[in-house]
Amino acid sequence: MNGSFLVILLGIPGILVATTVHEFVRALTSTVLGDNYPKSQGQVTLNPVKHFEPIGFLMMLYSGGWGKPVETSALYYKNRKRDTLLVAILPTVVNLILGLVFLFAYGTFRSKGYYIGTLLHYLAYYNVALAVYNVLPVAPMDCTKVLAV
């Protein structure tokens, strides 16, 4: 099997998990805080199909891409400032925590085989990368929403 194809193949679960969890946490947080729009759009789910756009997913395999953004409305939050911050910050925090969990698992299980080690490496990498990417102060990243509040 071609090495670069294998790298792409083993990276796909990392992309799927990181992006799906990120958008799911945003949708769930917004819904819990009173905004039912993400729920009405079917985005309060861990089904990756609901969180990806086909072109954005393909771009992620090669350079940088995007998931399907969860649309939220602060109009329905009880405390708009605090709740907007929570909706912006929590997905990134969860990605960072997941990345650290997968990094620990990688350190523990990498000697069990190349494939499991590589898979855990990419699960850690994409979660941490998405967290770092979202703290960049560039629209439409999460950091810009935090700075706007």
Task: Locate predicted features.
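Hydrophobic transmembrane alpha-helices and their immediate loop junctions
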Residues: 1-149
